[in-house]
From Swiss-Prot:
Catalytic activity: L-aspartate 4-semialdehyde + pyruvate = (2S,4S)-4-hydroxy-2,3,4,5-tetrahydrodipicolinate + H2O + H(+)
Lineage: Archaea, Methanobacteriati, Methanobacteriota, Stenosarchaea group, Methanomicrobia
GO biological process: diaminopimelate biosynthetic process; lysine biosynthetic process via diaminopimelate
Subunit structure: Homotetramer; dimer of dimers.
The protein's name: 4-hydroxy-tetrahydrodipicolinate synthase
Domain of life, per lineage: Archaea
Stated family: Belongs to the DapA family.
GO MF term set: 2-dehydro-3-deoxy-phosphogluconate aldolase activity; 4-hydroxy-tetrahydrodipicolinate synthase activity
Record site: Part of a proton relay during catalysis: T44, Y105
Active site: Y131 (proton donor/acceptor), K159 (schiff-base intermediate with substrate)
Keyword Cytoplasm in annotation: yes
Pathway this chain belongs to: Amino-acid biosynthesis; L-lysine biosynthesis via DAP pathway; (S)-tetrahydrodipicolinate from L-aspartate: step 3/4
Main location, first listed in the record: cytoplasm
Length: 291
């Protein structure tokens, strides 16, 4: 179930900062038409940090209600109790799995990381994917912590965004007997990560070019690296443009530019600069996704 290209969904907002429910449904339909294998609401790209608890639950409810593909909901927090609350709600809502970010800001030691994830896994019987993103959390989850957690029955994988293919290789090497899934957390490293045994990507770019991301991942998983490399190099300039500023600022603007929901952001995120928007437009036009 947890393989392929899965967009980390954008959460569209109205101009008065409310959740754009119809926009969210429209965005989900768009990525599904592009062939994605699942969707991931309430992650970094979904501006989960500025969603209230009720909004967080509402976004997950909408995703489950309208999705035709598996839903993996972001339910992590730097507060174990809150992460547990979000995870219980997501399980009750009918998601297929949850994504749990490593606690951020408070930077727990290895014992704290193990206790945090084990407490949630023991309390809620649902497949769980860890999320290691040091650029956001302030710490890189150690390989030995990951391999210990891989032995917990319902911790089934990790989204790895440390930027190290070597680390991914080490995780796969040390969890080879645990049926543990590694998903890329960086669009640009998806192909190399699949080449060492990764199963796919939780992707920002799949919000904009779901067909191309799905095509690249599908080809790579089948061993057709010639086709996968061709798509990888085709979309690489757009991927770079989507990270000219803090994610999801460019991704939301790109979605708006190609006719999806509004790119309105919640503070403290602000619109991208005119110069960077011009670069983004150039890449969207090159790929033919924007007229």
């Amino acid at each position: 179930m947890f393989e392929g290209a899965m967009p980390a969904l954008i959460t569209p907002f109205t101009k008065d900062d409310r959740i754009d429910r119809e926009g969210l449904r429209r965005n989900i339909a768009f990525v599904e038409e592009g062939g994605v294998s699942g969707i991931v609401p309430c992650g970094t790209t979904g501006e989960s940090a500025t969603l209230s608890a009720l909004e967080h639950e509402e976004v997950i409810d909408i995703a489950v209600e309208c999705a035709k593909v598996p839903v993996v909901a972001g339910t992590g927090s730097n507060n174990t109790g809150e992460a547990l609350q979000f995870t219980k709600h997501a399980a009750d809502a009918g998601v297929d799995g949850v994504l749990l970010i490593s606690p951020y800001y408070n930077k727990p030691n290895p014992a704290g990381l193990l206790a945090h994830f084990k407490k949630i896994a023991e309390a809620v019987d649902i497949p769980m994917i860890l999320y290691n993103v040091p650029s956001r959390t302030g710490q890189d989850m150690p390989v030995d912590v990951i391999t210990k957690l891989a032995k917990v029955e319902n911790i089934v994988g990790i989204k790895e965004a440390s930027g190290s293919v070597g680390k991914v290789s080490q995780i796969l090497e040390q969890t080879i007997d645990d049926d543990f899934v590694v998903l890329s957390g960086e669009d640009g490293l998806t192909l190399p990560i699949i080449s060492v045994g990764g199963s796919g990507v939780i992707s920002v770019a799949a919000n904009i070019v779901p067909d191309k991301m799905s095509g690249m991942v599908s080809a790579a998983l089948k061993g057709d690296y010639e086709t996968a490399r061709k798509i990888h190099f085709e979309i690489a300039p757009l991927i770079r443009a989507l990270f000219l500023e803090t994610n999801p600022i460019p991704a939301k603007k790109a979605a708006e530019l190609i006719g999806l929901a509004s790119g309105h952001l919640r503070l403290p995120l602000a619109p991208m600069s005119d110069a960077n928007q011009l670069k983004l437009v150039t890449e969207l036009k090159k790929l033919g996704v924007m007229k």
